């Protein structure tokens, strides 16, 4: 190829160097792909046969919730295909593209997507991030849950992914506004904990039950250390008279109470404390304890759960997650939860600013919506009502 270049006219050579220099100058950073004041432009080009293949792949509800999930993480049915993606004018070639989602967010017309930047070129990434997550907001007609929810977690000192809005087009077709959520890996861990060499687990409809130690999906880190820690927590949770002090030897309580109280404040009915779902647990090598992080936060700003609707359940606290439940059985746990919640209300829950943010987001994303997102403005009224109440 070098010899072919020598035979080209000098003008062509200059143009090629200029293009190369421009591409280099446009190298994206994490801040570039997680803006708060604009909507990302994400254009995907993929062979139509591959697009039809991945968008019709789906989970089977029965197999996804089968009792086999006790012993091993749920297998995903999704496969990668090769595609090109352009983000705000910067092109990434031969990336991996697949569908994502558990059950509620599945769609054949507007699927949630995973983009693997280093699918072919192992060095291809954005500020250390190799995987991009585009959530379709199917379960969140308001579109604001993930953007506002993760922002509050981070502002309150509870590590969480960053989030931005993205207009996603596939082969020129506008799929509407997606939530671009930072994949929980090294970038999140380093920002939140100052390290990334601990053991990270994702929890999807799993909890610390006897015989369920293999159900947590290990993403990074030492398998034996993580599994041993999970088994110790399970042993504790099986003890009806467990103390807060005992739990605190395995779970970082300062961070857990904050995490738990934020889930309650935001009405996160499908998170760890509300449904033993949508969470990450990180065995931090500094503390040698589990720290919890939110995930799948597209079901916020609701007074009550969409599952097991119970008018007797308190609105201010959720205790379906076993650690949350066990802590709330202790007087010390109740006291510390109340303190965490009151602190959030005092320092981070500003009704006027939250309502203003709803207005700002509405104006920001409305021009980019897909027709399937026609309920956006109407649904956003519910979020405003939740904030006011």
Regions found by a protein language model. Name each.
Residues 11-20:
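Bacterial N-terminal signal peptides
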Residues 25-389:
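Phosphate/dinucleotide-binding and metal-coordinating scaffold of catalytic cores
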Residues 1-6:
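N-terminal secretory signal peptides that target proteins for export/translocation
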């Amino acid at each position: 190829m070098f010899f072919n270049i020598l035979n080209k006219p000098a003008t062509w050579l200059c143009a090629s160097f200029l293009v190369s220099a421009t591409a280099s100058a446009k190298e994206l950073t994490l801040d570039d792909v997680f803006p708060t004041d604009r909507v990302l432009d994400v254009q995907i080009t993929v062979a139509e046969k591959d697009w039809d293949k991945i968008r019709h792949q789906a989970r089977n509800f029965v197999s996804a919730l089968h009792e086999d999930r006790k012993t091993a993480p749920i297998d995903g049915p999704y496969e990668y295909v090769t595609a090109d993606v352009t983000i705000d004018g910067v092109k990434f070639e031969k990336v991996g593209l697949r569908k994502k989602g558990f059950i509620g967010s599945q769609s054949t017309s507007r699927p949630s997507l995973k983009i693997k930047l280093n699918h072919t070129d192992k060095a291809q990434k954005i500020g250390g991030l190799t995987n991009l997550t585009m959530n379709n907001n199917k379960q969140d007609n308001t579109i604001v849950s993930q953007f506002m929810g993760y922002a509050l977690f981070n502002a309150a000192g509870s590590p969480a992914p960053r989030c931005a809005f993205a207009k996603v087009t596939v082969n020129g077709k506008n799929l509407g506004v997606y939530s671009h959520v930072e994949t929980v890996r090294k970038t999140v861990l380093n920002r939140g904990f100052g390290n990334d060499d601990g053991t990270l687990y994702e929890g999807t409809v799993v909890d610390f039950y006897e015989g369920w130690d293999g159900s947590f999906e290990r993403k990074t880190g030492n398998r034996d250390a993580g599994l041993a820690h999970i088994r110790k927590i399970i042993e504790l949770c099986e003890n009806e008279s467990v103390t807060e002090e005992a739990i605190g030897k395995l779970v970082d309580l300062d961070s857990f109470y904050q995490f738990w109280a934020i889930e309650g404040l935001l009405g996160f009915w499908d998170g760890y404390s509300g449904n033993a779902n949508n969470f990450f647990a990180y065995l931090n090598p500094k503390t040698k304890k589990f720290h919890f992080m939110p995930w799948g936060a597209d079901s916020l700003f609701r007074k009550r759960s969409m599952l097991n609707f119970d008018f007797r359940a308190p609105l201010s606290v959720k205790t379906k997650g076993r650690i949350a439940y066990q802590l709330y059985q202790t007087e010390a746990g109740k006291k510390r939860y109340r303190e965490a919640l009151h602190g959030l209300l005092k320092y981070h829950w500003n009704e006027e600013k939250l309502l203003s943010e709803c207005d700002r987001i509405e104006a920001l994303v409305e021009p980019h919506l897909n027709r399937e997102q026609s309920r956006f403005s109407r649904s956003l009224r519910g979020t405003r009502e939740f904030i006011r109440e």
